[in-house]
Amino acid sequence: MLNLTKLSPSITDMIRFDHSHVMVTFHQYTTSSKPSVKKALAETICTALEIHATLEEEIFYPVVRQINGSEPVIQKSAPEHNEMRRVIAELRATGPTELRHDELVMELMRDVIHHVADEETVLLPEAERLLGKDRLSELGVQMTKRRLELVKPKAGKIAANTAIGFSGSTAAMVLGVASALMAVKWVSKKAAA
């Protein structure tokens, strides 16, 4: 029988990948881009952040709170996610030709950079130290399954935004990772059969 835990990246590696994906997308966004590209990139950023925040809130943060709920980074995670959702709502209410749209993308980027720095320098290393490789892999499997549930209803929109917003090499990288995630799902179905 196939052990998915050994195939799945650890939850901390998945979180780092999410951070990298969003940062790459932010770097694709320029104020001089065509409105259709700006809209597609902004929507890609918003969707990725919403999915990422949901995964952290449902799977990662509860486990971290159990092992060290007093960690300041974990205590400020919920307010940071709430602020992110507020900015996303405001961003979606603006059009890509409005100056406010560009300002909100930059505000969101600053907030995300701060959040990523906290997680990657404090929270993720601590989780790796305290949880151990097997538990991190188990959580990675949970995160992969939940991610697929969250992505499935948005797959068409995600693909369209990727095609519009990304350069060829970036789109290929993103689609390659998406293909890998789908392969994990396929393998899990085969293993269960």
Where are these regions (language model features)?
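Small-residue-biased structural context
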Residues: 1-193
